[in-house]
Amino acid sequence: MSKAPRHFLDLLDMSTGELRAILDASVAMKKRRKEGLIADKPLAGKTLAMIFDKPSTRTRVSFDVGMRQLGGEAIMLTGAEMQLGRGETIADTAKVLSRFVDIIMIRILSHDALTELAAHATVPVINGLTRRSHPCQVMADVMTFEEHRGPIEGRTVAWTGDDNNVLASWAHAAERFSFNLNVATPQELAPNKPLKDWIRSSGASIRLGTDPEAAVRGADCIVTDTWVSMGDKDGEHRHNLLRPYQVNAELMRLAKSDALFMHCLPAHRGEEVTDEVIDGPQSVVFDEAENRLHAQKGILAWCLGAGG
């Protein structure tokens, strides 16, 4: 009987030990790459299928380059080409792709489509992003924090903005990696009920509130994201609600003097963050972007049993 594939769908699906093994492998791969040691090709002969229902820059390039650096190949399939769930069923798509490729990464708004694909695939499936969660991004974020400030355990991360997929994965990471997460959102844009219920039952050190100053006070890191995400409506109303949550120099001064600033990009400068902050010495946004490549290499290797 064949082994069940190692999927990477959500941080809560894996143990802390498994997530730490992925990060350790990612750090080691980055170090070897920086030292010019590029002969190691653990995924030689392997093919990654990348499925996108929306255009993507960072996710597409980082997975494509990452797979190539590990010795494998990547092919891209768009929503228009796939008609995922509109023509051939998701289940049949999963079964067919599993006969052609060794691993699948999908970036799709519907989390249910992701889980259905994984349920029927006989090869590993990676969550490249859904409306519910963005685990690859937060693995890169944790890696970035630890590069600059050491172990994240026991530290405090502050989120200011609204409820979205990145926040959900930060909450999951807080539970798995044992750090404190302070969340500040407008009441109208507070975490959704399933996430709020999970936070209450998880025992994680996560504090929900509406005051951005209280959330960031004494924090080791401040994180934000765009105010209007893919598919969001009522942009003007959201902007009015979120304007007090902008990360600016005044807000940064309430955090620790060496606090990091993170943003998964693309950023809308002058909205959720000022130029002064995102271009300032505490900003590590481009390290985060680079670490998407390295963290995802660790994830690819783990899923295919070549590391971790």
From Swiss-Prot:
Location comes to: Cytoplasm
Q: What does the record give as its pathway?
A: Amino-acid biosynthesis; L-arginine biosynthesis; L-arginine from L-ornithine and carbamoyl phosphate: step 1/3
EC numbers: 2.1.3.3
Which PROSITE patterns does this UniProt record tie to the protein? CARBAMOYLTRANSFERASE
Main enzyme class: transferase
Q: Name one GO cellular component term.
A: cytoplasm
Is Nucleotide-binding one of the keywords? Answer: no
* Family affiliation: Belongs to the aspartate/ornithine carbamoyltransferase superfamily. OTCase family.
Q: What is this protein called?
A: Ornithine carbamoyltransferase
Source organism of the structure: Nitrobacter winogradskyi (strain ATCC 25391 / DSM 10237 / CIP 104748 / NCIMB 11846 / Nb-255)
Taxon lineage: Bacteria, Pseudomonadati, Pseudomonadota, Alphaproteobacteria, Hyphomicrobiales
